[in-house]
Amino acid sequence: MSDICDANKLKYRFRGYFPVVIDVETAGFNSQTDALLEIAVTLLKMDNEGVIGIDKTLHFHIEPFEGANLEPEALAFNGIDPTNPLRGAVSEKEAFLEIFKAVKKAQKASDCHRSIIVAHNAAFDHGFVSKAIERCDLKRSPFHPFATFDTATLAGLAIGHTVLAKACIMAGIPFDNKEAHSALYDTERTAELFCHIVNRWKSLGGWPLLAVDEQDAQSDTEA
């Protein structure tokens, strides 16, 4: 792909995948048995210069599914009280129907053919999202069934640290540990980190890739 204008379109940047940044807060580590309590989803956009940034964020407090396990240690860690009526929690199905609607609309607007989850330690978030979708018997999920972009891995390569707070600070992104472990806060910081890495790679000349014929021509010139 030699056309720079095309290279600056989101649909070409990730092979037709639309990146969706997600963070979940849960009542444990087991996606099959432990409750999903909170989810935030950040949608991204790319400008005419090929710079990726945050578009908007959706945020939901989730009612534990029937029979869900609630690990006291997990609740103490994230500070969530599932019984607090002020949470304004909704069912998993209600939340994911809204998420599907927003993601599919943004995916279509970017002319992408599928969405891919971006998360910090993505296997964890992807597992809880996938299991919730399965419990709700929702069809035609916009998300790839197994592929993800893991910002812990990307940050380890690009910045030299895998912890979200440390990686953000090293990238010049403010991070307040008092706000951490809120799905809304962590999702937006993860989105900023992902965008920083992608944009930094572009600024260093890593994207767009030269087409094969351009590489050959450049090699001939240098020779």
Curated annotation (Swiss-Prot):
Mg(2+) 2 binds at D23, E25, H181, D186. The keyword RNA-binding does not apply. The active site is at H181. Binds two Mg(2+) per subunit. The active form of the enzyme binds two Mg(2+) ions in its active site. The first Mg(2+) forms only one salt bridge with the protein. Mg(2+) 1 binds at D23. GO terms for biological process: DNA replication proofreading; tRNA processing. Residues 20-194 form the Exonuclease domain. PANTHER family: DNA POLYMERASE III SUBUNIT EPSILON, RIBONUCLEASE T. Trims short 3' overhangs of a variety of RNA species, leaving a one or two nucleotide 3' overhang. Responsible for the end-turnover of tRNA: specifically removes the terminal AMP residue from uncharged tRNA (tRNA-C-C-A). Also appears to be involved in tRNA biosynthesis. Belongs to the RNase T family. This is Ribonuclease T. It comes from Shewanella baltica (strain OS155 / ATCC BAA-1091). The gene is rnt.
